[in-house]
């Protein structure tokens, strides 16, 4: 397969960002067995491709096992993923579980199936990981998914909550990782097209995208078109949280604040832009001191005046 210089720059960027995310969050360690969840979409194909490339030159030893869940959807091309994974020479497992029938039975026609489908898949994945001895489970969510989920939870759930790049399962037996956490969806889509991955559409939810998620995604894309780099800035904000400037009493001891104890950026308390500036201080009785606010150029003139007065006259 012949690729251009632009493709190799794209591939290098994806591998570099994935490697950085793995390092920043300690996602993969020496001796790990990682279950790589394959849905047949662009994200999971890209994740497997990048992880296998990193595995070859990593300074540690870890094992990758690709997994696909055959949910018994009508018309599902069950031969596609096994043939592709076999051509790569990677270890893989195809798990058959008829979650499709359960979802269609439980969810009324026209309603979104994503929530129930996700819970059922999660249960099968955890069980498979345990059976295979995999201590890490890799999912293909990327930067845009994380930012999108953050706004969904804020707008419709009243929580500042996103998708963590790494978390422990409720039973504490597995660690779920998202190696593509730093990667932009547009880069993943470009890479998938260039690699000509055999994409498998989802018949359960592909034609009935969650309306709320779609609206949030459209909003973010509009912001990005208006101000390129905005999604990057939002994601950066998720990694640069200042609890003292939010309103969650579980994250910051507001009730324990007292004079002489807290070191808080006072400028931002009044809605000002945070910047570093040398401050004036005074001691003594506050009642006995008068404070006058003057322009910086006037301060400069006042400081220079005594020097000019001391100069000898001609």
Curated annotation (Swiss-Prot):
<dbReference type="InterPro" id="IPR014729">
    <property type="entry name" value="Rossmann-like_a/b/a_fold"/>
</dbReference>
<keyword id="KW-0694">RNA-binding</keyword>
<keyword id="KW-0808">Transferase</keyword>
<dbReference type="GO" id="GO:0051539">
    <property type="term" value="F:4 iron, 4 sulfur cluster binding"/>
</dbReference>
<keyword id="KW-0547">Nucleotide-binding</keyword>
<comment type="pathway">
    <text>tRNA modification.</text>
</comment>
<comment type="function">
    <text>Catalyzes the ATP-dependent 2-thiolation of cytidine in position 32 of tRNA, to form 2-thiocytidine (s(2)C32). The sulfur atoms are provided by the cysteine/cysteine desulfurase (IscS) system.</text>
</comment>
<keyword id="KW-0067">ATP-binding</keyword>
<dbReference type="GO" id="GO:0005737">
    <property type="term" value="C:cytoplasm"/>
</dbReference>
<keyword id="KW-0460">Magnesium</keyword>
<keyword id="KW-0479">Metal-binding</keyword>
<dbReference type="GO" id="GO:0034227">
    <property type="term" value="P:tRNA thio-modification"/>
</dbReference>
<keyword id="KW-0408">Iron</keyword>
<feature type="binding site">
    <location>
        <position position="117"/>
    </location>
    <ligand>
        <name>[4Fe-4S] cluster</name>
    </ligand>
</feature>
<comment type="similarity">
    <text>Belongs to the TtcA family.</text>
</comment>
<protein>
    <recommendedName>
        <fullName>tRNA-cytidine(32) 2-sulfurtransferase</fullName>
        <ecNumber>2.8.1.-</ecNumber>
    </recommendedName>
</protein>
<dbReference type="GO" id="GO:0000287">
    <property type="term" value="F:magnesium ion binding"/>
</dbReference>
<dbReference type="InterPro" id="IPR012089">
    <property type="entry name" value="tRNA_Cyd_32_2_STrfase"/>
</dbReference>
<keyword id="KW-0004">4Fe-4S</keyword>
<feature type="short sequence motif" description="PP-loop motif">
    <location>
        <begin position="39"/>
        <end position="44"/>
    </location>
</feature>
<keyword id="KW-0411">Iron-sulfur</keyword>
<keyword id="KW-0819">tRNA processing</keyword>
<dbReference type="GO" id="GO:0000049">
    <property type="term" value="F:tRNA binding"/>
</dbReference>
<feature type="binding site">
    <location>
        <position position="205"/>
    </location>
    <ligand>
        <name>[4Fe-4S] cluster</name>
    </ligand>
</feature>
<dbReference type="Pfam" id="PF01171">
    <property type="entry name" value="ATP_bind_3"/>
</dbReference>
<dbReference type="GO" id="GO:0016783">
    <property type="term" value="F:sulfurtransferase activity"/>
</dbReference>
<feature type="binding site">
    <location>
        <position position="114"/>
    </location>
    <ligand>
        <name>[4Fe-4S] cluster</name>
    </ligand>
</feature>
<keyword id="KW-0963">Cytoplasm</keyword>
<dbReference type="InterPro" id="IPR011063">
    <property type="entry name" value="TilS/TtcA_N"/>
</dbReference>
<comment type="subunit">
    <text>Homodimer.</text>
</comment>
<keyword id="KW-0820">tRNA-binding</keyword>
<dbReference type="GO" id="GO:0005524">
    <property type="term" value="F:ATP binding"/>
</dbReference>
């Amino acid at each position: 397969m012949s690729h251009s210089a632009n493709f190799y720059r794209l591939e290098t960027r994806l591998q570099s960002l994935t490697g950085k995310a793995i390092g920043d969050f300690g996602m993969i360690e020496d001796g790990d067995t990682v279950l790589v969840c394959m849905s047949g979409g662009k994200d999971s194909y890209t994740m497997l491709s990048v992880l296998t490339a990193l595995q070859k030159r990593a300074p540690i030893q870890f094992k990758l096992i690709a997994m696909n869940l055959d949910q018994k959807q009508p018309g599902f091309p069950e031969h596609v993923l096994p043939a592709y994974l076999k051509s790569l020479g990677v270890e893989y497992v195809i798990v058959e579980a008829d979650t499709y029938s359960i979802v269609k039975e439980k969810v009324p026609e026209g309603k979104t199936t994503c929530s129930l489908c996700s819970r059922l898949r999660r249960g099968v994945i955890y069980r498979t990981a345990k059976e295979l001895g995999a201590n890490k489970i890799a999912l293909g969510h990327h930067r845009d998914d994380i930012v999108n989920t953050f706004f969904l939870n804020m707008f419709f759930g009243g929580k500042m909550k996103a998708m963590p790049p790494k978390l422990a399962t409720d039973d504490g037996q597995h660690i779920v990782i998202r190696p593509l956490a730093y990667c932009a969806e547009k880069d993943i889509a470009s890479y998938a097209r260039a690699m000509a991955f055999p994409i498998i559409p989802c018949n359960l939810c592909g034609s009935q995208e969650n309306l709320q998620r779609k609206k949030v995604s459209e909003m973010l894309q509009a912001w990005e078109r208006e101000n390129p780099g905005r999604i990057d800035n939002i994601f950066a904000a998720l990694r640069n949280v200042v609890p003292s400037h939010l309103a969650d009493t579980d994250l910051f001891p507001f009730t324990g604040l007292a004079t002489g104890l807290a070191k808080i950026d006072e400028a931002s308390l009044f809605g000002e832009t945070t910047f570093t500036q040398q401050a004036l201080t005074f001691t003594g009785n506050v009642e006995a001191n008068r404070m006058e606010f003057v322009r910086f150029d006037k301060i400069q003139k006042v400081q220079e005046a005594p020097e000019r007065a001391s100069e000898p006259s001609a």
